[in-house]
Design a protein with these regions (language model features):
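Glycine-rich phosphate/dinucleotide-binding loop and adjoining beta-alpha-beta core of small-molecule
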Residues: 1-139, 208, 212-216
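Hydrophobic alpha-helical scaffolding
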Residues: 3, 7, 32-33, 147, ...
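Short, small-residue alpha-helix embedded
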Residues: 88-89, 143-177
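Short beta-alpha connecting loops at secondary-structure transitions
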Residues: 90-91, 137-144, 154-158, 183-192
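Short, charged, surface-exposed loops that flank catalytic or proteolytic processing sites
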Residues: 95-102, 164-169, 190-194
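Short, well-structured alpha-helical segments that form the helix of a local strand-helix-strand
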Residues: 102-110, 167-181, 196-204
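Charged C-terminal helix
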Residues: 182-216
Length: 216
């Protein structure tokens, strides 16, 4: 992790950022980043220099919503993981509309920008870049609304990318694993008693039981 950006300068030397990117199989940017000018600089340099699959989440999505020019260097191996509030800022659609038309809105954003979109709702929609494929994930629980749960999803997707999955498959399978892990954790700790780390801790158990799933 590069650390939270607090100043107006890039929060780490550019050479160090390039070294981190070059040594990575996948990258996540956004969780815990903040929205300072230093965060803008980090997002800009990461987006322009990253060649490996990139998961864009949280504050990185909010910064892109404020500065769409950051997408000028977009690539098809990027995965955006917005919740409805972030999707509203990215698209200017109202949240109720996004909830009602999640499939169409995710697909439209995918088609316009050429990135995979994993729109996190009660039944998440994954619109795959460079494809007409759209997956709908039906696993999950209201417990996934916990703070930090979305960060867990980003980490799951990045882990699958590191295993060699294509971005669309990693996003779809990651959403399924995340939902099932939430169900397992909620069964153990109750809907109101779980924390994001409990969801993460349940992922290995879910993966062992889900290895035979195939995406069509």
């Amino acid at each position: 992790p590069a650390g939270q950006a607090k100043n107006q300068r890039l929060p780490l030397p550019l050479a160090r950022l390039e070294e981190l990117l070059a040594s990575s199989k996948a990258v996540v940017i956004g969780p815990g980043l903040g929205q300072s000018e230093a965060a803008v600089a980090l997002v800009k340099e990461t987006l322009s220099r990253c060649e490996v699959p990139l998961v864009v989440d949280a504050d990185a999505l909010n910064l892109i919503a404020r500065r769409p020019s950051l997408l000028s260097c977009r690539k098809s191996n990027w995965i955006f993981t917005p919740h409805p509030g972030e999707m509203s800022r990215l698209t200017e659609h109202e949240i109720p509309e996004i909830l009602c038309e999640s499939r169409a809105i995710a697909a439209a954003y995918r088609d316009h920008y050429g990135v995979t979109v994993c729109l996190k709702t009660s039944e998440s929609v994954i619109a795959v870049a460079e494809s007409q494929k759209i997956y709908r994930n039906e696993s999950g629980t209201p417990a996934l609304a916990k703070a930090g749960s979305g960060d867990v999803l980003s980490g799951i997707i990045a882990g699958l990318l590191c295993l060699g999955m294509e971005p669309g498959a990693a996003a779809a399978y990651g959403a399924y694993l995340h939902g099932r892990a939430g169900q397992v954790a909620a069964g153990k700790f109750s809907l109101h008693g779980i924390l994001a780390r409990d969801i993460a801790d349940a992922v290995p158990t879910v993966m062992r039981s889900a290895q035979t799933i195939e995406l069509e």
